[in-house]
């Protein structure tokens, strides 16, 4: 290396050089490529395309031109980058599904919502859209500054004098270095109304702007769920907006329905959406779809989803929302360049920046027009003086040797200006007046006089000259008023905005559904009573309650399940499609789910494994499902009572399980040889009844247990068990305040009479032969509960809850049912009402539904009556109650086959 070359080298620290170079690169990307300007809402490439088309005269009123020519002009003059980047930007500005107000009018294939690419630029044609002219209007009036292009051969505008807030109307998106922007499109009319509100009151609150700017207005329509994301975006510049496609449900006959999707969320690929739905159906994550086809055409989107027979369309639609991009979110980052620097702005700041920019544009335009008007008035003043002194003017011209001599003579001569002195003052043309108040022609005026045609000397032309001068003076006066009054300037700004609104505003496409939608999608689900069935093998299903018909006690039943021999039903309960449920597993985890999300089936259907519905771990299975009240306030006042097979109990606050993650939450710690028997909601003034398979029961108050906050506690001893015995049921009863003596006295009244008293029938206390007063008897009758006990061999009975004395927890309990080999062990104990119905399921899947009014009420220490005829080897495995419904009332003709009166044992 020579000394000369080495002397040109400057040693630098590589760390410093990296910092400087990377910062330069980052700012170049931010300012010159990826981030739009808050004033016109355009990135450099879009601005250059619009300006180049305007310069080339490629306006909306002119014929289309090849897109390749437009791209070539932009690339050659202003944007020395790849032609594909320019063409892609041009294509997007022509897509009516990408921009709310397309800025380019394209002819040919400009892509589709399916993600199809546009045709090559040599095939497509383009021109400016009509609204695009509002971006460049007045650009020739020195409204914005110009900068040299990349090689200094041309000049390009640093910003377009946009007459509407394009950043909000069409939105923008881009990824720079270390930052990104994602601004949704809005409705032009709403945005202009917001600008007018801001012009009227610069101190307006953002929430007041939200009264007119309802939210984004996407070109693809669809819906926005809730306003919390909108408020966050407009207040802070950042937020997440939930978008949902629009779908309709149609009846297509034969108990079949179809879902018709007519609008999809913004920027969602329609073809990919259809593929995703098909994929979810194949994976059985979406059930009930029999056919799927895309029937979209030039008239709009139409995705046809045909459903299987008797499938609830709302459920399938919600599954589609949950599993596909038919419902997605738009992350708002309102980042734009303000004064050349990137800044996240709220709605008011964006509008304020635009209004401030338009003030500058109108001011610059007014100054330009004022100067032009004064220049023209200057000439007209000279012509007016010349016409008034035409004879002398002609003499000077005739006496001059040439035009230059004539011009110099005209300029040297002083002319009387008394008759036009007021006009000169209005025009503010001080150059024409000397100290004596006389006028001297300027070179411009002298030249105009020499070029004046003789026809201007006619009387009509003289009058026209004076009229033109007066009109110019009016214009100049108006321009001076604008420049001297900000109020007048803002009036013009508003007038121009309103004109743009009147010409280009369109109705809102995107509707906003108000409310909270975290858990409210079940509002689309029809309220229907469902029977939920759970099997030992971990299968679960829901079946409409109307699918089961009522039978009388002793009937043979109907097939309720179609299962393999090794699978049996373990739990059945009835709830609404809107019922929230907690799922408790064998390892002490708890999960949350709404009932309508369970797979819909028929009485013979097997259902679906719970491992496919809940995120269960290896060797984990659900042991208990607890339906909760639908009312949130009612749930907030409840506790949860846990009961295990070994007799342990624990009282917890239901609020501890209010918010559950998708992967569940620890509910209780269990010993290896113990299992969770039941979990039920309870209140402070209620009682707990634990029942064992050996026919024992223990009743104690809920308030005797303290609330345990630790979810990892295994609780305290609830009941002392004999060897081989275990707890099989936990029942929540009403609290009672009567004494044992009063309860015993009340129970001495025949149960038939007690039921009549509870119905409001008149009675004579003396005839009952008890020491209780009539009000006490009525109160106890109205509060009386009955306990149903069912055994594995189909025996059952109802007993008054008053017969179960209240003791402390931890005892051995009292006899609940007299069991023997004929009755078998107890499988279910629960409180019942007179109008309830009983549902029993056997290990073979057979099911019977009968009214409880046919089950006799007996004493506590009895064996009951036969409820269900069993075949050899058949056992009752599940017991559930069904409240009386419209379906059962309609089914008044009950089956009479195989009915037998059973006798009390």
From Swiss-Prot:
Residues 35-524 form the Topo IIA-type catalytic domain. It catalyses: ATP-dependent breakage, passage and rejoining of double-stranded DNA. A motif (GyrA-box) lies at residues 551-557. The active site is at 123 (o-(5'-phospho-dna)-tyrosine intermediate). Pfam families: DNA_gyraseA_C, DNA_topoisoIV. GO terms for biological process: DNA topological change; DNA-templated DNA replication. It is an enzyme of class 5 (isomerase). Its EC number is 5.6.2.2. It is found in: Cytoplasm. Residues 886-905 have a biased composition (Acidic residues). Residues 885-905 are annotated as: Disordered. Keywords: ATP-binding, Cytoplasm, DNA-binding, Isomerase, Nucleotide-binding, Topoisomerase. Its main location: cytoplasm. One of its GO terms (molecular function) is DNA negative supercoiling activity. InterPro entries: GyrA, GyrA/parC_rep, Gyrase/topoIV_suA_C, Topo_IIA-like_dom_sf, Topo_IIA_A/C_ab, Topo_IIA_A_a_sf, Topo_IIA_dom_A, Type_II_DNA_Topoisomerases. GO terms for cellular component: chromosome; cytoplasm; DNA topoisomerase type II (double strand cut, ATP-hydrolyzing) complex. Heterotetramer, composed of two GyrA and two GyrB chains. In the heterotetramer, GyrA contains the active site tyrosine that forms a transient covalent intermediate with DNA, while GyrB binds cofactors and catalyzes ATP hydrolysis. Few gyrases are as efficient as E.coli at forming negative supercoils. Not all organisms have 2 type II topoisomerases; in organisms with a single type II topoisomerase this enzyme also has to decatenate newly replicated chromosomes. A type II topoisomerase that negatively supercoils closed circular double-stranded (ds) DNA in an ATP-dependent manner to modulate DNA topology and maintain chromosomes in an underwound state. Negative supercoiling favors strand separation, and DNA replication, transcription, recombination and repair, all of which involve strand separation. Also able to catalyze the interconversion of other topological isomers of dsDNA rings, including catenanes and knotted rings. Type II topoisomerases break and join 2 DNA strands simultaneously in an ATP-dependent manner. HAMAP family: GyrA. Belongs to the type II topoisomerase GyrA/ParC subunit family. This is DNA gyrase subunit A. It comes from Rickettsia conorii (strain ATCC VR-613 / Malish 7). The gene is gyrA.
């Amino acid at each position: 290396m020579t000394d000369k070359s080495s002397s040109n080298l400057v040693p630098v620290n590589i760390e410093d050089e990296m910092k400087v170079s990377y910062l330069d690169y980052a700012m170049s990307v931010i300012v010159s490529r990826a981030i739009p300007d808050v004033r016109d809402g355009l990135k450099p490439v879009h601005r250059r395309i619009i300006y180049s088309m305007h310069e080339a005269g490629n306006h909306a009123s002119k014929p289309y031109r090849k897109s390749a020519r437009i791209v070539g002009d932009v690339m050659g003059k202003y944007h020395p980058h790849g032609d594909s980047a320019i063409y892609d930007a041009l294509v997007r500005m022509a897509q009516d599904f990408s921009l709310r107000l397309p800025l380019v009018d394209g002819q040919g294939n400009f892509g589709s919502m399916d993600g199809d690419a546009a045709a090559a630029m040599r095939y497509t044609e383009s021109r400016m859209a009509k609204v695009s002219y509002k971006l460049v209007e007045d650009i020739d009036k020195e409204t914005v500054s110009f900068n040299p292009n990349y090689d200094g051969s041309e000049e390009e505008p640093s910003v377009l004098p946009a007459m509407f807030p394009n950043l909000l109307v069409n939105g923008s998106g881009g990824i720079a270095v270390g930052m990104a922007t994602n601004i949704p499109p809005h409705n032009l009319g709403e945005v202009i109304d917001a600008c007018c509100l801001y012009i009227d009151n610069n101190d307006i609150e953002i929430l007041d702007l939200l009264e007119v700017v309802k939210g984004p207005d996407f070109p693809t329509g669809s819906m926005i769920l809730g306003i919390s994301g909108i408020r966050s975006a407009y207040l802070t510049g950042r937020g997440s907006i939930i978008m949902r496609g629009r779908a309709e449900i149609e009846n297509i006959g034969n108990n079949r329905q179809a879902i018709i999707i007519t609008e999809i969320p913004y920027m969602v690929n329609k073809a990919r959406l259809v593929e995703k739905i098909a994929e979810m159906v194949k994976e059985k994550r979406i059930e009930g779809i029999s056919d799927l086809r895309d029937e979209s055409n030039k008239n709009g989107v139409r995705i046809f989803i045909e459903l299987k027979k008797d499938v609830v369309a709302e459920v399938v639609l919600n599954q589609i929302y949950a599993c596909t991009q038919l419902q997605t979110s738009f992350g708002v980052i309102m980042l734009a360049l303000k004064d050349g620097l990137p800044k996240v702005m709220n709605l008011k700041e964006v509008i304020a920046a635009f209004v401030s920019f338009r003030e500058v544009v109108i001011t610059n335009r007014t100054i330009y027009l004022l100067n032009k008007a004064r220049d023209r008035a200057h000439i007209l003043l000279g012509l007016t003086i010349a016409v008034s002194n035409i004879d002398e003017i002609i003499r000077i011209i005739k006496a001059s040797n040439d035009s230059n001599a004539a011009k110099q003579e005209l300029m040297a001569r002083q002319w009387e200006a008394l008759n036009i002195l007021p006009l000169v003052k209005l025009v503010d043309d001080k150059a024409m007046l000397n100290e004596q108040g006389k006028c001297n022609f300027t070179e411009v005026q002298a030249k105009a006089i020499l070029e004046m045609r003789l026809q201007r000397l006619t009387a009509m032309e003289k009058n026209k000259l004076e009229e033109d001068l007066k009109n110019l003076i009016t214009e100049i006066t108006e321009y001076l008023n604008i420049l001297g009054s900000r109020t007048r300037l803002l009036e013009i700004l508003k007038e121009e905005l309103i004109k743009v609104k009147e010409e280009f505003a369109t109705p809102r496409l995107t509707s906003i559904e108000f409310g909270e939608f975290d858990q409210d999608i079940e509002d689309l689900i029809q309220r229907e009573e469902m029977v939920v069935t759970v099997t030992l093998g971990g299968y679960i299903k829901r079946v409409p309650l109307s699918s089961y018909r009522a039978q009388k006690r002793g009937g043979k039943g109907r097939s309720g399940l179609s299962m393999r021999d090794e699978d049996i039903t373990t739990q059945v309960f009835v709830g609404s499609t809107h019922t929230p449920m907690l799922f408790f597993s064998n390892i002490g985890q708890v999960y949350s789910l709404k009932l309508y999300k369970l797979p819909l089936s028929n009485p013979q259907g097997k259902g679906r494994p719970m491992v496919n519905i809940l995120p269960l771990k290896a060797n984990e299975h659900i042991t208990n499902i607890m339906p909760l009240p639908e009312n949130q306030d009612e749930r907030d006042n409840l506790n949860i009572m846990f009961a295990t097979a070994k007799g342990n109990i624990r009282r917890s606050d239901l609020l501890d399980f209010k918010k559950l993650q998708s992967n569940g939450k620890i509910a209780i710690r269990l010993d290896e040889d113990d299992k969770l028997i039941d979990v039920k909601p309870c209140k402070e003034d209620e009682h707990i009844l634990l029942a064992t398979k050996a026919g024992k029961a223990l009743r104690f108050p809920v308030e005797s247990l303290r609330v345990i906050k630790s979810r990892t506690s295994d609780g305290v001893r609830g009941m002392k068990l004999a060897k081989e015995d275990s707890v099989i049921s936990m029942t929540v009863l009403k609290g009672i305040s009567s004494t044992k003596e009063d309860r015993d006295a009340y129970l001495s009244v025949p149960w038939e009479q007690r039921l009549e008293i509870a119905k409001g029938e008149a009675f004579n206390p003396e005839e009952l032969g008890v020491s209780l007063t009539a009000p006490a008897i009525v109160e106890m009758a109205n509060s009386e509960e009955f306990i149903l006990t069912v055994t594995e061999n189909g025996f059952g009975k109802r007993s008054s809850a008053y017969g179960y004395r209240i003791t402390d927890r931890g005892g051995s309990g009292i006899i609940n049912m007299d069991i023997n080999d004929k009755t078998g062990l107890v499988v279910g104990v629960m409180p019942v009402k007179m109008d309830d119905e009983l549902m029993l399921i056997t290990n073979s899947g057979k099911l019977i539904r009968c009214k409880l009014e046919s089950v006799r009420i007996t004493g506590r220490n009895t064996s009951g009556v036969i409820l269900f005829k069993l075949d050899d080897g058949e056992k009752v495995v599940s017991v559930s109650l069904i409240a009386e419904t419209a379906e059962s009332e309609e089914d008044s003709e009950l089956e009479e086959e195989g009915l037998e009166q059973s006798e009390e044992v």
